[in-house]
Amino acid sequence: GVSAVLHGSLVAYSNDVKTRLLAVPPEILAAHGAVSEATAGAMAAGALRFSHADWALSITGIAGPSGGSSAKPVGSVCFGWCGPDGRVEVETRIFSGNRESVRQQSVAHALEGILGRAVTLES
């Protein structure tokens, strides 16, 4: 089953959960906001430490239909990946579509990202 490859998951909508459980520094949230590459990277690193897994990923974004701004429009999604070597990689994408479409595209991109990184590292 999935327990062979998934150690766990955490939904960290609130900044409080991000800081308490994932050890995202409050300074990062204050300076960059919850939807940022800095936050996504810190979330992935914290998830790896928290879970003792080989890999961790994070997704933070604005799926809509509201909540966007000119700097961070609806569809803005930041990703973080952290692997066994401790290196954190981040990326931002802007997806189009409704809330469900943005969520589906985000999940697909995050999983493709971790799979590609895991295969590359093992090569």
Residue ranges and their predicted role:
Residues G1-S123:
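Short alpha-helical segments enriched in small residues
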